[in-house]
Amino acid sequence: MFQTINEISIHPELYNQKKVLIQGWITNIRGNLKIIFVELNDGSSFKNLQCVLKKEFIDFDKIENLALGVAVEISGIFSNTPERQQFGEVLVETLEIKGNNYNTNFPIQNQEISLEVLRQMPHFRHRSRLFRAIMKLRSALFFEIHKFFRRQGFINFSAPILTSNDGEGAGEVFIVDDENKDFFNKKTTLGVTGQLHAEAYALGFKKVYTFAPTFRAERSNTRRHAAEFWMIEPEVAFFTLEQIIELAVKLLQKVIKSVIIRNKDEFIFLEKAGDKNLRKRLLQFCDSQVTQISYEKAIELLLEHQEKFEEKDLFFGCDLKTEHERFLTEEIFHMPVVIINYPKNLKAFYMHQNEDGQTVAAFDLLVPGIGELIGGSQREVRYEKLLARMNELNMNIEEFQWYLDLRKYGNPGSSGFGLGFERLLMYITGIENIRDVIPFPRTNKNILM
């Protein structure tokens, strides 16, 4: 019966002076002719397990191929060592090499290797200490998000990946077809959002959410953009703008705090490697009231510092750039901030039109270091208003008739938002490039493997 490093590290006292059997990969090796110290990781924990090989028990001639990256199976006696920094070590009785290196130069020779270098080998980078921490937190965050929605009474809804509708209207889509170019007999793309379909399911289930890959053919080669990424998109019938903002803030604060509590080792490592105040900053947000301002007020505040921006052309109706969003969160409020009531020409066609005729009931939640993290709105439920807006934008009404029809039958209105999973992970880890928080990144001009 094999044990995992995670099982042993949680309750090392239960395994003290007992025989254990472990499978894993060598992450560090050092020693001399009489004793060898091997650090092992099996993927179950961020922590490594130190294994001690003594010549009196192990034939060193049979393990001369031991090296970084080699897969091994060991058995031996575990000793709990609370007086040391490590949780314990194993005095190895048997060691069997299960996966050798064909080349002694395993790509991850240095555990402190930079993220820039690791990007060139996405199939190996999870075996570095830094990327292991990021991926462990990614998995934990994934789980906490699903748990949050389950506890809030949401239904998980699987929106289609293939669609004939561009829900964002930006035209940045990947076209899908077979070699004969006639598979669907109409233009079909990879989905840019699951929102439109989620709206349909909210009318019946009330509270639904999607959590799935999203595809956008954006040619923006920035540290925040990817062609394939994951989106969390809840949709709630009967909800107003204020209620959906409250849900968005609650989601962030709950899942961030839970991830911090349950993943102490990863955060300690990340703080040593980068932001020393990472947890302090995140917990401050979790325990604070989030400031909410109008788009108009945001423009006024930014105009007071106009000379500090590369993009100085600020006016009512301009699209806020990342530098503006970050300035608001980092220099003015020093915290995440919610901006509401954007000009309708900056937002998608489906958003509720306010009485002023100029703005829509939309919101963006901005965070330090990134800018926009969440974008959402109250949806336009008035059939004629929605139709007029679609005509104004010269949209194909026939393609979206099903969406219009949702307004005809028992529609009380709904609200929802989209949260970029990778951007949230960037915020939580302090990692500055989206390519470093996703296993196999797909970006403009780049698709390794």
Curated annotation (Swiss-Prot):
Principal subcellular localisation of the protein: cytoplasm
Alphabetical list of CDD domains matching this protein: EcAsnRS_like_N
Pfam families (alphabetical): tRNA-synt_2, tRNA_anti-codon
Domain of life: Bacteria
Alphabetical list of InterPro entries matching this protein: Aa-tRNA-synt_II, aa-tRNA-synth_II, aa-tRNA-synth_II/BPL/LPL, Asn-tRNA-ligase, Asp/Asn-tRNA-synth_IIb, NA-bd_OB-fold, NA-bd_OB_tRNA
Family: Belongs to the class-II aminoacyl-tRNA synthetase family.
Name assigned to this protein: Asparagine--tRNA ligase
Species name: Mesomycoplasma hyopneumoniae (strain 7448) (Mycoplasma hyopneumoniae)
Gene name linked to the record: asnS
